[in-house]
Amino acid sequence: MSILISPSDNRGWGANMRYRRRASMRGVGRRRLTLRQLLGLGSRRRRRSRPTTVSNRLVVVSTRRRSSRRRR
């Protein structure tokens, strides 16, 4: 039984490790984007109040489109 179970376990671990690495990379990218957006929003909000909302919405839409393309 151990001989039959070992190869399947190894494959499962390999798939999990690869998936985790990809997920971690995506998480880091998202965190970096959010930090950049927060910094940008803070500086923009201090300078102007109303136009920032429009630019922020455009940025969010562009990021969502890019993420969807990457996922596919």
From Swiss-Prot:
Site (Cleavage): G14, A15
PTM description: Cleaved near the N-terminus by the viral protease during virion maturation to form the mature protein.
Propeptide span(s): 2-14
Residue positions where N-acetylserine is found in the record: S2
A GO MF label: DNA binding
GO cellular component: host cell; host cell nucleolus; viral capsid
Coiled-coil region list: none
Keyword field: Acetylation, DNA-binding, Host nucleus, Late protein, Viral penetration into host nucleus, Virion, Virus entry into host cell
Superkingdom of the source species: Viruses
Induction: Expressed in the late phase of the viral replicative cycle.
Alphabetical GO biological process terms: symbiont entry into host cell; viral penetration into host nucleus
Quaternary context: Interacts with the core-capsid bridging protein; this interaction bridges the virus core to the capsid.
More info: All late proteins expressed from the major late promoter are produced by alternative splicing and alternative polyadenylation of the same gene giving rise to non-overlapping ORFs. A leader sequence is present in the N-terminus of all these mRNAs and is recognized by the viral shutoff protein to provide expression although conventional translation via ribosome scanning from the cap has been shut off in the host cell.
Function per UniProt: Strongly bound to viral DNA and responsible for wrapping and condensing the viral DNA. Probably promotes viral genome import into the nucleus and is still associated with the viral DNA when the latter enters into the host nucleus.
Family, similarity comment: Belongs to the adenoviridae histone-like nucleoprotein family.
Name of the protein: Pre-histone-like nucleoprotein
Organism of provenance: Fowl adenovirus A serotype 1 (strain CELO / Phelps)
